[in-house]
């Protein structure tokens, strides 16, 4: 399911001549396995999540947005933890690059092309490997 959305995103961007696409990433149940503990951030990555996120960080055509309901102090801890693995995000819970336009109002719901979130059906145990294979096919020209 997620690979179809990503493939469609790449095809659409190519047809439209977009220089960038916007991907939103949840933390719990998506990048990291949830630990269900208060005052202790999750630290167990799903298989292939680190490799994929590092690949995405090398691409200038993908803007990475951290999409999380974590508390601000937890977000800081997650950003520090991710940074140890070379995983960085361009924005947190916002996309200031896409302003309101003829197609949508983006002040209350930010714009993205791809959403990776367990609540949207993302399966951290299987989807990262599928994304890894897909990204190897969609290299930057």
Language-model features, listed with the residues they occupy:
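HAD-like aspartate-dependent phosphatase fold
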Residues: 1-141
């Amino acid at each position: 399911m997620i690979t179809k959305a990503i493939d469609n995103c790449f095809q659409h961007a190519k047809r439209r001549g977009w220089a960038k696409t916007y991907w939103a990433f949840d933390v719990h149940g998506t990048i990291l396995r949830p630990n269900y503990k208060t005052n202790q951030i999750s630290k167990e990555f799903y298989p292939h999540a680190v490799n994929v996120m590092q690949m995405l960080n090398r691409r200038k055509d993908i803007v990475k947005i951290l999409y999380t309901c974590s508390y601000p102090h937890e977000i800081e801890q997650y950003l520090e933890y991710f940074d140890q693995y070379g995983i960085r995000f361009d924005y947190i819970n916002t996309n200031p690059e896409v302003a309101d336009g003829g197609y949508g109002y983006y002040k209350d719901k930010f714009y993205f092309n791809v959403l990776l979130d367990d609540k949207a059906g993302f399966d951290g145990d299987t989807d990262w490997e599928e994304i890894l294979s897909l990204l190897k096919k969609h290299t930057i020209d």
